[in-house]
Amino acid sequence: MAEKFIKHTGLVVPLDAANVDTDAIIPKQFLQKVTRTGFGAHLFNDWRFLDEKGQQPNPDFVLNFPQYQGASILLARENFGCGSSREHAPWALTDYGFKVVIAPSFADIFYGNSFNNQLLPVKLSDAEVDELFALVKANPGIHFDVDLEAQEVKAGEKTYHFTIDAFRRHCMMNGLDSIGLTLQHDDAIAAYEAKQPAFMN
């Protein structure tokens, strides 16, 4: 089973860019592995680093700013996660330490992949996201409270409501990925298999 997500309080980093695609999130040269770990080192590689090997940090990229080290909530603009349908993108984000991405909209495949990997994609309106960017930029180091059960983001003095599909919400709150969901029906699967002719097993 995956880690349960019910509530999270975390440092927010503002990535003020629209249409951030999966190749920017995790460039294709780092996709050779099939395990979910180790991708965080290459998250936003072409933006975070001045060299291809990822050894010279770019001081002008927001994730490298001292006040955002340890951030676990990413604030972004519309159409986050567009481009090719690589599951490595949420792998890289979670491996880096992100638990939540807040944006006005997400690419559909990235949105689904995020839930599969216990990364919570929160959709708020453009106006609400504008407010949050202004808040974060005026208060570097601010933390948000994200409550999946109540479907709320508490930021400063305001509370923002978001909506998550009930099934996906249930899965995240109970730490259920596709394997976990299957294991919930392990007894029924075993009983079904026991009834089948031997040549079918």
Curated annotation (Swiss-Prot):
A Gene Ontology BP annotation from the UniProt entry: L-leucine biosynthetic process
Organism: Escherichia coli O9:H4 (strain HS)
Lineage: Bacteria, Pseudomonadati, Pseudomonadota, Gammaproteobacteria, Enterobacterales
Name recorded for this polypeptide: 3-isopropylmalate dehydratase small subunit
Function summary: Catalyzes the isomerization between 2-isopropylmalate and 3-isopropylmalate, via the formation of 2-isopropylmaleate.
InterPro entries, per database record: 3-IsopropMal_deHydase_ssu (IPR004431), Aconitase/3IPM_dehydase_swvl (IPR015928), AconitaseA/IPMdHydase_ssu_swvl (IPR000573), IPMI_Swivel (IPR033940), LeuD (IPR050075)
Pathway terms, separated by semicolons: Amino-acid biosynthesis; L-leucine biosynthesis; L-leucine from 3-methyl-2-oxobutanoate: step 2/4
Catalytic activity, as annotated: (2R,3S)-3-isopropylmalate = (2S)-2-isopropylmalate
CDD domains reported for this sequence: IPMI_Swivel
Molecular-function annotations in GO: 3-isopropylmalate dehydratase activity
Subunit structure and binding partners: Heterodimer of LeuC and LeuD.
GO cellular component, one term: 3-isopropylmalate dehydratase complex
EC annotation from Swiss-Prot or TrEMBL: 4.2.1.33
Entry keyword set: Amino-acid biosynthesis, Branched-chain amino acid biosynthesis, Leucine biosynthesis, Lyase
Pfam families (UniProt xref): Aconitase_C (PF00694)
Family named by the database record: Belongs to the LeuD family. LeuD type 1 subfamily.
